[in-house]
Amino acid sequence: MTKISSSDVRKVAQLARLELPEDQIETYTEQLEEILSYVDQLQEIDTKNIPPTTRAVEVVNAMRDDLVEVNCSREDLLNQAPHREGDFFRVPKIL
């Protein structure tokens, strides 16, 4: 079992830029030890006959065919722009 000290908890909190009250250091120390104990148990499981995976459930992308549809003409869209220049939208300079 991995032993966590209160100084380890303080160091992790510092690295994560967290301010932990002193009265909670012991609580977090115990909780981290429990978590690492659980991870140790997982490390002991024999997984050599289990193929590596990236997720528990296989996900398949449901793709549809792309269909070209004409909804508006270019001119109709450009006529709705507050400012236009030829066949382009004119927008304020941002840089």
Swiss-Prot record:
It catalyses: L-glutamyl-tRNA(Gln) + L-glutamine + ATP + H2O = L-glutaminyl-tRNA(Gln) + L-glutamate + ADP + phosphate + H(+); L-aspartyl-tRNA(Asn) + L-glutamine + ATP + H2O = L-asparaginyl-tRNA(Asn) + L-glutamate + ADP + phosphate + 2 H(+). It is an enzyme of class 6 (ligase). GO terms for molecular function: asparaginyl-tRNA synthase (glutamine-hydrolyzing) activity; ATP binding; glutaminyl-tRNA synthase (glutamine-hydrolyzing) activity. GO terms for biological process: glutaminyl-tRNAGln biosynthesis via transamidation; regulation of translational fidelity; translation. Transmembrane segments: none annotated. Keywords: ATP-binding, Ligase, Nucleotide-binding, Protein biosynthesis. Its EC number is 6.3.5.-. The keyword ATP-binding applies. Allows the formation of correctly charged Asn-tRNA(Asn) or Gln-tRNA(Gln) through the transamidation of misacylated Asp-tRNA(Asn) or Glu-tRNA(Gln) in organisms which lack either or both of asparaginyl-tRNA or glutaminyl-tRNA synthetases. The reaction takes place in the presence of glutamine and ATP through an activated phospho-Asp-tRNA(Asn) or phospho-Glu-tRNA(Gln). Heterotrimer of A, B and C subunits. Belongs to the GatC family. This is Aspartyl/glutamyl-tRNA(Asn/Gln) amidotransferase subunit C. It comes from Prochlorococcus marinus (strain NATL2A).
